[in-house]
Structure formats: structure tokens, C-alpha cells
């Protein structure tokens, strides 16, 4: 049997809204991780609800919205649509994420793909994911 040529890449990590906002502020941490993950042949997922939330938090900041528009075009990034399966799965996380739909979608994605959860707000997900799955992005730039 011939191997599939277009197998989907492995999702190694998921960016939440706070990690996307860190990138939109021009912090280097997310970009460095993106290079490492892409060099390994995997991708970092951007859940659409987290992306929408990051855009909403950046309204009026043209630089931040430009960086958000850029990151989703980069090699090594996979935008995760909110399809029926994701909506159903993410909805089950809403009660534990204090009603945060963006966080719920990102947590669901990390669990569904056994991927690292990249965040600047680890305290918000400490009860939702095992500690080894949470990767803290520094809130301040290096």
C-alpha cells in the first residue's frame, strides 16, 4: 500500500487567545516556538474562536491586527475551524472555563490532539489540563 502523500501534519501545540495576543504585541516567544515546531514537521493550531477573541481584543490596534492576520498565513500554523464536532466538544468545556468560549475551544483542541496548550494565563487552565500539557508563554517580552 502506498503512503498517503497529503497526510495532515501533527498538531503539536495550540495557541490560546492570550498567546495570540502576546504574538500580536510583537513578543518573540510564540515565533520562536513556531520555528521549532515547523522545523520538526508539525504545526501549531490556532482555534478560530481564540483567533476571533484575539482580534476583538485588538480592535483599534492596526499593528496587532496585522500581526494576527500574518500569523495565520505562516508555514507551521493550522487554523482550526469550529465545525460541528469541535463545537460539541468545546461546549463541554465551557462550564469549567468560566464561560470563556475561546478558552473552551483551545482546551478542547489541545485535548483532542494531545497537544501542548500555549498560554500566558496558565492559572486559568490549571484545572482543565494536566500540568505537563500547559506550556507557559512569558507575559512580558524577552
Where are the predicted features?
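Alpha-helix capping/helix-boundary segments
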Residues: 19-20, 50, 86, 105-106, ...
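Amphipathic alpha-helical segments within well-ordered protein domains
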Residues: 52-55, 91
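Acidic catalytic patch
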Residues: 73-97
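Short, hinge-like loop/turn segments at secondary-structure boundaries
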Residues: 61-65, 97, 134-137
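Short active-site oxyanion
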Residues: 40-44, 75-78, 111-116
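Acidic, PIN/NYN-like endoribonuclease modules and their adjacent C-terminal/linker elements
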Residues: 1-8, 107, 111-142
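Short, well-structured N-terminal submotif of metal-dependent ribonuclease cores
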Residues: 1-46, 56-72, 141-142
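Short beta-strand scaffold positions
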Residues: 46, 81, 101, 119-120
